[in-house]
Amino acid sequence: KKNKKVFTHGHFLRPQDVAMLSALGLNKVKVTRKVIVGLLSNGNELINPGKRKEDNKIYDSNRYSLFSLLNSNSIKVLDKGIVKDDYNKIKSQISDLKNNCDLIVISGGASSGSRDFIIKIIKEIGAIKFWKVSIKPGRPFGFGFFNKKKPILILPGNPVACFVIFFLFGEVLLNYIQGNFSYKKSFFIVKSNFSMKKKFGREEFLRGRTFVKNGIMYVNKFYKQGAGILNSLVWSNGLIRLRSNKTIIEKNSDLEFYPYER
């Protein structure tokens, strides 16, 4: 219909949207460029996959999971790799990312001995807005800005916590940067197939897997919920949200479930 709005600002163009634009006779439309995200892992103990494993070393799984999450959001990634616990090297890499990216994502520094380096550097050339949140997993999570408008995420070093925090907050922030201001994480209500107790005043996000029984969708939680247990992410198909005011979860309770796949 004439003068009818087809798409709003910030709409991500899908194949069917391109078909619609073509059917309207449009061969050109104005779009925003891809968001550039700077990625950096920090820690003396980290090595890249494919390298020979040495004592007291761990493979850097965080950067690769973040890279995959970012690619699924049509993001251009500037990967700085692993930066060891050297103040000047860390500052140099962060400064470079600050000048060339729309968003900076750092993993590792938030829960290792090097976190003081990260926080000090950001305070020197930017500002920390908050540090540590009442969420499990993911308490050592920091957020700040450079030049009052360029955000930086400091993610936990534990791989599950890193994934959960970016899944919950990073994707929302990316959509906001892209102009999709109304974006919210999607969830639906499921019935718990388990019971448990939790700490009051803290939100928890359990790794869970849904199933349908007699037309009702239930969810099981992974038997072990540690912040470093990657099996829990592989086994699950989404996150179960336990609100901060809850202390007891009874079987057949209504719970919010955030699927990994949209």
Regions found by a protein language model. Name each.
Residues L13, I82-I90, I135-P140:
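Short acidic loop-to-helix transition motifs that present clustered carboxylates
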